[in-house]
């Protein structure tokens, strides 16, 4: 009987610690998402935008497919994420299929041949598309995290 009571107590403590740990993780992820969203809105650098997007995607990957998920919205976000990753994938410092980095790299290599307004337009495209992706994931996850 004594053993059963002690075991129950230990299990109850472990249950509380586990539940509290996931709540802390949820709060940490929520806070990090808010920080990244603010940085995304304030940053004017294309490389920083891409770095922020990858970090937001990492957080999204932790929570997608869990209970209470909106399957249709996640399918849309997954499509956007996969498209983004395909366009920005870098392997050993070299763009996999060109994509965003190919555009920016080509612009940097041919800087003399490409007008400044074209370079600026390409960078603005990277920044705006990345901000849209970050905002979409942010809105979805913040809504989902409020449910918990």
Curated annotation (Swiss-Prot):
The keyword Cytoplasm does not apply. One of its GO terms (biological process) is response to bacterium. This is Protein Turandot Z. It comes from the Eukaryota. A humoral factor that may play a role in stress tolerance. InterPro entries: Turandot. The keyword Secreted applies. It comes from Drosophila simulans. It holds the Pfam family Turandot. GO terms for cellular component: extracellular space. Residues 1-23 form the signal peptide. It is found in: Secreted. Belongs to the Turandot family. The gene is TotZ. Keywords: Immunity, Innate immunity, Secreted, Signal.
């Amino acid at each position: 009987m004594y053993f059963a009571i002690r075991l129950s107590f230990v299990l109850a403590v472990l249950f509380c610690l586990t539940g509290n740990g996931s709540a802390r993780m949820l709060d940490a992820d929520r806070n990090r998402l808010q920080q990244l969203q603010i940085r995304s809105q304030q940053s004017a650098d294309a490389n920083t935008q891409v770095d922020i997007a990858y970090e937001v995607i990492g957080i999204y990957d932790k929570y997608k497919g869990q209970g209470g998920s909106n399957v249709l919205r996640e399918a849309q976000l997954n499509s956007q994420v996969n498209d983004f990753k395909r366009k920005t994938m870098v392997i050993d410092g070299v763009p996999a299929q060109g994509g965003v980095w190919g555009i920016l790299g080509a612009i940097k290599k041919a800087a003399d041949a490409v007008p400044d307004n074209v370079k600026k337009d390409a960078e603005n495209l990277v920044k705006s598309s990345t901000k849209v992706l970050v905002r979409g994931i942010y809105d979805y996850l913040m809504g989902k995290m409020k449910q918990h």
